[in-house]
From Swiss-Prot:
It comes from Bradyrhizobium diazoefficiens (strain JCM 10833 / BCRC 13528 / IAM 13628 / NBRC 14792 / USDA 110). The keyword Cell division does not apply. NCBIfam families: hisD. The lineage of its organism: Bacteria, Pseudomonadati, Pseudomonadota, Alphaproteobacteria, Hyphomicrobiales. Its cofactor is Zn(2+). Pathway: Amino-acid biosynthesis; L-histidine biosynthesis; L-histidine from 5-phospho-alpha-D-ribose 1-diphosphate: step 9/9. InterPro entries: Ald_DH/histidinol_DH, Histidinol_DH_CS, Histidinol_DH_monofunct, Hstdl_DH. Its EC number is 1.1.1.23. This is Histidinol dehydrogenase.
Length: 431
């Protein structure tokens, strides 16, 4: 059964704090195992990569078989049904349109002293996209990661995807082509992350690694950060639904289960001021669970990490939502916009009963790569900005240096950095 909390209970604060602190991540020896793999690939390159692929994916290759060929991609596209390809194309187009609006603008201006200042944006040269394999192979995630990179101007986009027993999801390859991926390699796990970061004879290193994966992939991304950039450390998926008594219990239950079916560690939460709705949603969840193909996963998620939180009024939901900082926030109330405007922390917000989070997963246009595990308190979802760098620009002439130089020299001396002061003083004939 899910956790039931009531804001009016005397022990609510204690129970809510415990609920927030409950760990949903796989831990134990994952980091040590990932470190061993990353270090091995860094040392031995392709040899270590091929050994790990044989061990974990039961796929024996030589280095020439790592890259997925153009012929394989073409065959995969032909194997996909037309309706699904059309849906992927629609998703790609909407994602591209949305992300083009995020492109930042360069700036250059002159201040009252005549100093020229500004900044400019440039795309990173290369990015690596990690795509999970097996049952968690999601072509939509390929588009969500690849399209913003291409919009930003990344010229080399490398995809790695595990191929258990040699099998690749044709839709993943089709999405890679639609998204503008330039290279695809049939490797996964911590070993693929290591190859993208350190490079091997076959796979050239990239500047940044993005994309979700299991606990070993997440640990490997932590380990290579600094050598390369990373997007975020993705945890189990989560949704928070805030609803009043106008909410449709069947719809809300379906949305809660849409997250629960992802992973046994996924989290689905309802906050409501309606006791009737809370009871109806709980009944609807139990009924719908019986009809889901992934009922075992969804049932475990709902039982272990689900929650229904009662509040006296929806004003009480606001600080709770900010504390939860959910990856996905759905608001099904009479005035969802007004409530959303008062909530600070959420990865993405879905307004109104006709905006299920699943639309955002696929064809809404906004990105579904979002901060989890309360990291929406300080971070944002994937965007064009993740694939770009901002460089500041400064230009002084003789007059501007004379106006600003003495103050800079004073600060240099105050910090004990005499060479700093001298580099200015020589230009002003003061050193």
């Amino acid at each position: 059964m899910p956790v039931r909390l009531d804001r009016s209970s005397a022990d609510f604060d204690q129970r809510f704090a415990a609920f927030l602190a409950a760990k949903r991540e796989v831990s134990a020896d994952v980091e040590a195992a990932a470190r061993a793999i990353v270090d091995d690939v860094a040392r031995r390159g392709d040899a270590a990569l091929l050994e790990a692929t044989a061990k974990f994916d039961r796929l024996t290759l030589d280095a020439s078989g790592l890259r997925v060929s153009a012929a394989e991609i073409e065959a995969a596209v032909k194997a996909c049904d037309a309706a699904t390809l059309d849906a992927l194309s629609l998703a790609r187009d909407r994602i591209e349109t949305y992300h083009r609006r995020q492109l930042p603008k360069d700036e250059r201006f002159t201040d009252p002293l005549g100093v020229e200042l500004g900044w400019r944006y440039t795309a990173i040269e290369s990015a690596g996209l990690y795509v999970p394999g097996g049952t968690a192979a999601y072509p939509s995630s390929v588009l969500m990661n690849a399209v913003p990179a291409k919009v930003a101007g990344v010229s080399r986009l490398v995809m790695v995807v595990p191929s258990p027993d040699g099998k690749l999801n044709p839709l993943v390859l089709a999405a890679a082509r639609l998204g503008g991926v330039t290279e695809i390699y049939r490797v996964g796990g911590a070993q693929a992350v290591a190859a993208l970061a350190h490079g091997t004879a076959t796979i050239a290193p990239v500047a940044k690694i993005v994309g979700p994966g299991n606990a070993y992939v997440a640990a490997a991304k932590r380990l290579v950060f600094g050598k390369v950039g990373i997007d975020m450390i993705a945890g189990p998926s989560e949704v928070l639904v805030i609803a009043d008594d106008t909410g449709n219990a069947d719809w809300i239950a379906a949305d809660l289960l849409a997250q629960a079916e992802h992973d046994t560690s996924a989290q689905s939460i309802l906050i409501t001021d309606s006791a009737r709705l809370a009871a109806d949603v709980e009944k609807a969840v139990e009924a719908q669970l019986k009809t889901l193909p992934r009922t075992a996963i969804a049932s475990a998620s709902w039982a272990d990490f689900g929650a229904i939180i009662m509040v006296k009024n929806l004003n009480d939901a606001i600080p709770l939502a900010d504390a939860i900082a959910a990856e996905h926030l759905e608001i099904m109330t009479t005035d969802p916009d007004a409530l959303a405007a008062r909530i600070r922390n959420a990865g993405a917000v879905f307004l109104g009963a006709h905006t299920p989070e699943a639309i955002g997963d696929y064809v809404g246009g906004s990105n579904h790569v979002l901060p989890t595990a309360r990291s929406a308190r300080f971070s944002s979802g994937l965007s064009v900005h993740d694939f770009m760098k901002r460089t500041s620009i400064l230009k002084c002439g003789p007059d501007q240096l004379r106006a600003l130089g003495p103050a800079a020299m004073t600060l240099g001396k105050a910090e004990g950095l005499d060479a700093h002061s001298r580099s200015i003083g020589l230009r002003l004939n003061l050193s």
